[in-house]
Amino acid sequence: MSTAKLVKTKSSELIFTRNDVDEEVKTTTIVTLNRIVIELVDLALITKQAHWNMRGNNFIGVHEMLDGFRTAILEHQDTIAERVVQLGGVALGTVQVTNDKTPLKSYPTNIHTVQDHLKALADRYGIVANDVRKAITEVEDDDTADIFTAASRDLDKFLWFIESNIE
């Protein structure tokens, strides 16, 4: 017999869980978590777009660096999406939802040089890194704040690496 059931709350529907975080805290935390999931889905896709399409000086170094970034972004995305579900929410990670809700500007498909890609990536990594850092203090759930802190450390490092390669 399944113990999963929907529990009506004031602002949303949560899936039953024995996690005793306050329902209002769960609901607001899930909104913040999903905001970051959406940003990370977009950032992972953008990173791969740049990885595939750049050419020029320092190509191989940046190409390989971006693979590592994308792997880490996907790991954080997975952890954050799973936290949504742990709190009784539904993780919003589809391309359709991401397209509708991402704060990131559309990534240009008409750039080719390593430098142009690095500049475009720096703008987008900066937005996500700053938003994740802001989310740490927005949430009232310590476990979620800890998850965001881990992601923030990596995103700040990745932004630093990208900016350090811009000539």
From Swiss-Prot:
Catalytic activity line of the entry: 2 Fe(2+) + H2O2 + 2 H(+) = 2 Fe(3+) + 2 H2O
InterPro entries: DPS_DNA-bd, DPS_DNA-bd_CS, Dps_gammaproteobac, Ferritin-like, Ferritin-like_SF, Ferritin_DPS_dom
One GO CC annotation: cytoplasm
Regions crossing the membrane: none
Enzyme Commission number, as recorded: 1.16.-.-
Keyword terms of this UniProt record: Cytoplasm, DNA condensation, DNA-binding, Iron, Iron storage, Metal-binding, Oxidoreductase
Superkingdom, taxonomy of origin: Bacteria
One annotated GO molecular function: DNA binding
Location in the cell: Cytoplasm
GO biological process assignments: chromosome condensation; intracellular iron ion homeostasis
Primary site of residence: cytoplasm
Assembly and binders: Homododecamer. The 12 subunits form a hollow sphere into which the mineral iron core of up to 500 Fe(3+) can be deposited.
Record family assignment: Belongs to the Dps family.
Function (record text): During stationary phase, binds the chromosome non-specifically, forming a highly ordered and stable dps-DNA co-crystal within which chromosomal DNA is condensed and protected from diverse damages. It protects DNA from oxidative damage by sequestering intracellular Fe(2+) ion and storing it in the form of Fe(3+) oxyhydroxide mineral, which can be released after reduction. One hydrogen peroxide oxidizes two Fe(2+) ions, which prevents hydroxyl radical production by the Fenton reaction.
Protein name as catalogued: DNA protection during starvation protein
Lineage: Bacteria, Pseudomonadati, Pseudomonadota, Gammaproteobacteria, Enterobacterales
